[in-house]
């Protein structure tokens, strides 16, 4: 068990990582495209067919100052029985993604603020949702309620090297 707990008892799981990413444009105007450092933390607890999960990012972004700060990424309760279950809270909803092609994976919006400078998994944005599952060995049915709309984030600030708007040229 974790921290001296016996098998079958509830336990806490702690995980995390630190990563840093920097990109410099080698052609004119020879500027920084991205410069950020992130601490990602994950905390989970399992107990009696249920689990709690929380993940967060603490980020320093040297170029996009408004992106510096703390972000609660996911925070949900997951419960499973033999043939049904539910997940309630802030979560990533991923349906049918395959190597960067999003055919049915359209529930969680994307943060395109630093489009090519982030991993595909990191540009997905969590949604507040209730997911209800019914399943057996042959089929899984999922009902989803997302009470609040959250759309894609597009880089529109002219100071952002990834801006979708045309830059004014002198």
Predicted regions and their residues:
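Transmembrane beta-strand segments of Gram-negative outer membrane beta-barrel proteins
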Residues: 6-26, 35, 50-54
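Surface-exposed beta-loop-beta
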Residues: 160-170
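Short intrinsically disordered, low-complexity coil segments enriched in acidic
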Residues: 1-4, 143
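Short catalytic helix/loop segments, enriched in acidic residues and glycine
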Residues: 32-44
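Outer membrane beta-barrel
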Residues: 44-162
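Outer-membrane beta-barrel domain signature
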Residues: 3-7, 26-32, 62-65, 117-119
């Amino acid at each position: 068990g974790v921290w001296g707990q016996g098998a079958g008892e509830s336990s806490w799981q702690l995980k995390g990582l630190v990563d840093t990413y920097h990109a410099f444009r080698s052609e004119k105007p020879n500027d920084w495209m991205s410069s950020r450092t992130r601490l990602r933390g994950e905390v989970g607890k399992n107990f009696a067919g249920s689990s709690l999960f929380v993940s967060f990012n603490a980020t320093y972004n040297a170029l996009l100052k408004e992106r510096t700060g703390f972000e609660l990424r996911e925070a949900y309760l997951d419960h499973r029985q033999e043939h049904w279950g539910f997940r309630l809270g802030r979560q990533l909803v991923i349906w049918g993604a395959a190597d960067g092609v999003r055919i049915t994976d359209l529930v969680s919006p994307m943060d395109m603020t630093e489009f090519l400078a982030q991993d595909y998994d990191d540009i997905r944005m969590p949604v507040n949702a209730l997911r209800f599952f019914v399943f057996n060995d042959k089929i899984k049915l999922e009902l989803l309620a997302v009470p609040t709309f959250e759309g894609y984030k597009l880089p529109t600030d002219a100071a952002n090297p990834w801006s979708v708007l045309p830059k004014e040229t002198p």
